[in-house]
Amino acid sequence: MENKERSGIFPLLIATSYVLMIVMNALASLLPINGKTTGEVSDSYPNLFAPPGITFAVWGVIYLLLAGYVVYQFFVFSKNRDATTTFTLIRVGVLFVISSIFNIAWIVAWHFDFILISTVLIIALLICLILIALNFRNKKLTFREKLFVRLPFSIYFGWITVAVIANITILLVDIGWNQFGLPEALWTVLIILVGAAIASATMVFNKDYFYILPVAWAYVGIIFKHIDADGFNRRYPTVYFAAAIGIAMMFLAFIYSVILRKLPKHKEDQLPESDNSKDPSGEQT
């Protein structure tokens, strides 16, 4: 009885949090909240890191993928699964609900120019996504679990990584920080390169190739904004060259991760297996 109740209530809780998050994000653009769109708030804190508005179209992809995750929950909890898989999916679901609350709260704080609070909230959202990613690390997932669970959160995690960097940058603008006396362009170069290094290391550590895609997309956007005549019109070449280097770093990390995955993990993996140790049903993560 308890499992049946959970199979009905838990997906509804996930779906409700998702719908509320979508509604709040829609209102942020349609009303808009506090008379400003999300992009207009960002533009009111000029800096050299913020990607152009077109890059934020990735949110449409994220919410579409998360919709697939939400629908999938109504099927996954209606079937009998092993305890480990069920527990993993429950933890992911709980973290998703919490992350949706942080997402909603961030929208409100952002639109009312509570930049410090919004920074704390988006970092909390990032932590939720980090914990979700750790739940998938070294787990053997079915194709459906990869498609409907891991993929949505990989893209979401990657984009929020960029969003945290952008939010912190805007916070520094808000408080009038002087970048330790460094020129703004040089400071932005450092942020871009450190961000690329963190994203590359995260991808390799989590063995998650899709995570890097939205980060690279944001860096492409930074390049576009800096070379576009309606943007910075090539006034800061070091910034868009740094973004290009960042993309190259992520690509090399991707190649390294692919090669590393092909290598045998342990010497004993190369030894003949005994009859009792064979598991023909094993699936690569």
Which residues does each predicted region cover?
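Central hydrophobic cores of alpha-helical transmembrane segments
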Residues: F210-I222
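Alpha-helical transmembrane segments of multi-pass membrane proteins
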Residues: Y18-G35
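Membrane-interface helix caps and helix-loop-helix hairpins in membrane proteins
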Residues: A105-T119, I175-L182, M203-N206, A229-R234
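Membrane-interface transmembrane-helix boundary segments in multi-pass integral membrane proteins
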Residues: A50-F56, F180-A197, F224-L252
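Short aromatic-rich membrane-water interface segments that cap or initiate transmembrane helices
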Residues: D43-V58, L147-S154, W177-W187
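Membrane-interface capping segments at transmembrane-helix boundaries
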Residues: R6, F75-K79, F136-K140, F254-L271
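Alpha-helical transmembrane segments of multi-pass integral membrane proteins
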Residues: T16-V23, R91, L95-W106, I122-L134, ...
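N-terminal membrane topogenic signal
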Residues: E2-I14, W59, L213
